[in-house]
Structures are given as structure tokens and as C-alpha cells.
Curated annotation (Swiss-Prot):
Pfam families the record matches: ADH_N (PF08240)
Protein name: Trans-enoyl reductase lepG
Sites where the protein binds substrate: T178, G179, L180, A181, T182, A183, G184, L185, G320, Y321, T322, I323, Y324
Gene that this sequence comes from: lepG
Lineage of the organism: Eukaryota, Fungi, Dikarya, Ascomycota, Pezizomycotina
Keyword Oxidoreductase: yes
Keywords in alphabetical order: NADP, Nucleotide-binding, Oxidoreductase
Length: 398
């Protein structure tokens, strides 16, 4: 197989060391990822000069975005690091939030990987220039138009960033941020389940509806590490993969009796269900699967109220951006007050998740590396809107 190597455009970044110039691999077959590239931490003497402007994807209206030049580079606060973006990945929340509550001229995008080029004063004990990192930015932010990952630079609190282990490439790392944060917030903060470093002794079944999604992929693995027994739904073609991740059993969501089948398999014992899909059919399946004594249902999107058919089931939905501890001033139903308790949770969760990544205990979601850079992201989002992307995350080198 042929591969092409493209250097990132470094016209706005002056480096005192030539080895600091990042690069990306593109495969002639976009479904295949090349082996991880070696990365190096820069010596302390390395100096980065950052241009005042950058290219970024800006939201122009519902379903509309464009790549713009001359955009300001986000300011790096004492608690932040500034990252030169190498790769970005698309999530459903990117286009859903921009379609339903667009913040005009805000930078778009959530998941990224890249290299640290500025370290805020409060982060200097943990990060150095040139460190390889990944995370989830607060894109489409109505309060700060410079935030967002679909750009050449992103500023993000150091507490909300993972260092990339040596055996994970920038392309792979770009798929981690949103899924791992959402999985942790759902399982441990919202449902209150036992953490991986203190696994439960009395194993219980937990339903993950949508085990083929990126968040579902992480949830299945985290539940196993936490001592639970995950069962999941997905398409039949994904059965082998979700079982390899740790699912005790997989059920075809196309089956009209899916919920009843799960309830029978788990002997009427399920108390916890997570809905990674969130529509009337997925909610009905989860409510049917939850045992007769009731339980908790958590969705990753606003759920249809008409689907809340059981009084003994507590239903909630979460939005991952609450880990920033700031208000989410989007339109209803996405608008949220600041959740400082979620920020405190994130401060505890990220070090635990970092250890799991470092120890190789988490498999990452399948990805498809696309060409086209930032303009390609817009085209990929349009494909995702039309449900033309399944089972993989689209990744782009910037």
C-alpha cells in the first residue's frame, strides 16, 4: 500500500527545532490507518512563536459552516494549554448542536489531538512544550467564539486533556476525547456506579443501548473494568466486536422483541440502562429491558417525553460539555446552568482515564482517516447528517 506524507502548513509557526514540525500520514485507502508515528517531547529550550491568526471552521448558521482565514488564536489562560491541532474527529454532537443552536461565527468542533505549544502557569508541573495530547473542546461556544477544535490551534484547560501514550497515533487519539469523557460522566457521575479502580464486588447487568458507537465502545469496557456485566444492542455485524470489548451478550436492535429478549436474558434484573442512540425506539427497548423493580435510564440526547412510560424508572439525559463547569447557553433543550459538580468530577476522572490509556486497558473506536483537511470536515459532517457514516469515526489531519 502506498502512503503519502504531508507536512502541516507551518507558515504561521516558527520553531527553533526542526523536529517540532508535525506531520500526518494519509492512506490511499481511507479506511486503513497507518502504524502510529513516533512522537517526541520537545526539550525545555524549544521556543514556539505563535501567529496572531489561524484558519478555523466558523459556524455561519443552521447547517452552515465555512473555513475562514485570519481568525484569532485563542488566548491561553493560566489554567490552559494551547495546542497546535494535528488531527480532529467528527462527533454527532458537532453537527447536532450547530444545526439546532448555532452560535454565529463561533469555532466549531470538539475532538482533537495535537502538540502543546504554550503551557499556562498552572499547568507547568504536568505539561511541557511539544507534549502530544488529546481532548474535547467546547466548540460552538456562544460565550467564546475562539474555542472549538476545528482549527489550527485550540486552548483547553489542562485538567481536561489526556497525554497520548506512545503506542497511539494522533489519528487514533483524536477519537478519544468526547467518548471517554461522556462514558465517565454517564456511568460514574450520573448513575453513580463503582469506578474501575474500585470495582464492585456484586456483579450486576448494565444495558448499553448502542454498543457500536464510540461512547458505547468505552462504556462496555469501563463497565467490565468496574466489575459489572455489560449487555448491549447493535447491528448483527458488530456482535463479535462488542463481545470482544467485554459485552456478555449482544442483541440486534432491529428485532421487534429486543427489549424483552434482554429482560429475559438478564432474568428481570437490570437496574441501569444507558441509551447512546436516544429515539423513541431505543427508549422503548431500554424501558422494556429494565427489570420490574425499576431503575435508572440515562440518554446522551434529549429523549422523547412520550417514551417515559414507567414511573419506577428515573430518566435523565446528559451533555458532556458540563464537565467545563460553565453555563451552556444554547437553545432549549440544550441550555444548561453551570454544573460545578461535573467539573469536580472531571478533575477526578481524567487521571483515572489517563492511567487506563497508559496501561493499554482501553481499545479505541474504529476510525476512517479522510483527506481534505478542514474543508473535508464540513463535507464529512454533511455525510454524518445523512446517516451515511456508521461504525467508524471520521478523522481529518489539519
Amino acid at each position: 500500500m502506498k502512503h503519502r506524507r504531508y507536512k502541516l502548513d507551518d507558515s504561521n509557526l516558527l520553531l527553533s527545532s526542526p523536529c517540532a514540525v508535525a506531520s500526518c500520514w494519509y492512506s490511499e485507502n481511507p479506511a486503513t490507518l497507518s502504524p502510529p508515528r513516533p512522537r517526541h517531547t520537545m526539550p525545555a529550550s524549544v521556543h514556539f512563536e505563535i501567529s496572531a491568526t489561524q484558519r478555523a471552521i466558523k459556524i455561519k448558521g443552521p447547517g452552515q459552516a465555512s473555513v475562514e482565514k485570519g481568525c484569532p488564536v485563542p488566548a491561553c489562560q493560566p489554567e490552559d494549554i494551547l495546542v497546535r491541532v494535528v488531527c480532529v474527529a467528527l462527533n454527532p454532537v458537532d453537527w447536532k448542536s450547530a444545526d439546532l443552536s448555532p452560535s454565529l461565527d463561533a469555532t466549531w468542533g470538539t475532538d482533537f489531538s495535537g502538540e502543546v505549544v504554550v503551557v499556562g502557569e498552572a499547568c507547568q508541573s504536568r505539561f511541557a512544550l511539544g507534549d502530544s495530547v488529546c481532548g474535547a473542546a467546547f466548540g460552538n461556544n456562544p460565550e467564546d467564539a475562539t474555542q472549538g477544535a476545528f482549527a489550527e490551534y485550540v486552548a483547553i484547560p489542562g485538567e481536561l486533556v489526556y497525554k497520548i501514550p506512545p503506542d497511539i497515533s494522533f489519528e487514533q487519539a483524536a477519537t478519544v476525547g468526547t467518548g471517554l469523557a461522556t462514558a465517565g460522566l454517564t456511568l460514574y457521575q450520573t448513575l453513580g456506579l463503582s469506578w474501575p479502580d474500585q470495582p464492585v464486588q456484586d456483579a450486576q447487568y448494565v444495558l448499553v443501548y448502542g454498543g457500536g458507537t464510540a461512547s458505547g465502545c468505552f462504556m462496555i469496557q469501563l463497565l467490565r473494568l468496574s466489575g459489572y456485566i455489560p449487555v448491549t444492542t447493535c447491528s448483527a455485524k458488530s456482535f463479535d466486536r462488542v463481545k470482544q470489548l467485554g459485552a456478555a451478550e449482544a442483541f440486534d436492535y432491529h428485532s421487534p422483541g429486543c427489549g424483552s429478549e434482554i429482560r429475559e436474558y438478564t432474568e428481570n434484573s437490570i437496574k441501569y440502562a444507558v441509551d447512546c442512540i436516544t429515539n423513541i425506539d431505543s427508549m422503548k427497548c431500554c424501558y422494556t429491558a429494565i427489570g420490574s423493580s425499576g431503575g435508572q435510564y440515562v440518554a446522551l440526547d434529549p429523549f422523547p417525553i412520550r417514551g417515559h412510560t414507567r414511573r419506577n424508572v428515573k430518566a435523565r439525559w446528559i451533555i458532556g460539555y458540563t464537565i467545563y463547569g460553565r453555563p451552556i447557553n444554547w437553545k432549549h433543550p440544550f441550555k444548561r446552568d453551570a454544573q460545578p459538580q461535573d467539573r469536580e468530577f472531571a478533575k477526578r476522572w481524567y487521571p483515572v482515564a489517563q492511567r487506563l490509556l497508559d496501561e493499554g486497558k482501553l481499545q479505541l473506536h474504529p476510525l476512517q482517516v479522510e483527506t481534505g483537511g478542514l474543508p473535508g470536515v464540513i463535507e464529512g459532517a454533511n455525510r454524518s447528517r445523512k446517516h451515511q457514516v456508521t461504525g467508524v469515526k471520521l478523522v481529518y489531519c489539519v
